[in-house]
């Protein structure tokens, strides 16, 4: 029988005995299964029959919006972990966007999260709660089934959430909340926009949530291990942009209350970038980071990596543009670690203009008294390769520089 770690004494989940979350069976959930299946069929059949590039653009934009503002900021970092403070109207808007992901209502999603979190911290964990079965069985379980425990533990949700009338309304009507945006999409673009902007969006979000969850608990790198926990989170670098930073799951298991998930050099975290923008606008405050959390004696570092801290300067865009314009003549050279892109791929992209230095914090370029890091550095080094590469770099540099300025200039603390 698993014992309850001291760290769980203040957890929202209160089981009579910890083994309560081990004893249960996985059963088909008709409503859950019908919800996902109907959305998926409508997305595939209706989406293919009415495809337009405009509708596909609506799908991409709406999916990115609800994942960033809804799931990552609203549901996860705010509602579940309360890792920053914001005006109530903005909190409501973010959480409402989270409902548009199509996973559950706000209270149901919080309960699901807390049960998994509690169970995964114990020395043993049910396969359903740990994504511990085979790939296809886990897909069936998570997308079409539910875990029915023999004795359900009590889950204590703070009255500010559980007693909130708006959240209780969303909990009762979360499936119906797809209708308002669907009606708007229909008015603008007809059935094509509905199939792509609603059905395909919900299907992609729900399926993607399971898929990332499966890999983030079974495969991927780790900076930390939680001793005594049955399940360790894993970092999935290649999906950091798609998930708005949520795929840095090992970091999240280590510091669950942190508003920042991409904690180390090269770990892109769009959710964090947006929090910095909102903070600059005065819309959020009291941001929690790892150093603000209580010490966890069970948390153990596995490598010597240090959280990203000091930025490599803040050059003006004019300086970056000047380097790009003269990149071929100046013989620009780029060096740094291969974090998101492999060293082999960087060598193919940049040729002799790249030196792999695993100990470096980030990719960097230094020339003519200007130092650039990250994506701008990659753009400048790429521009030195050929005319076509330079044209691509010209198109990408403004976005790369803007992202870098958000990362450096708006960095909390």
Mark where each language-model region is.
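Non-catalytic, topology-defining segments of multipass membrane proteins
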Residues: 1-210, 258-413
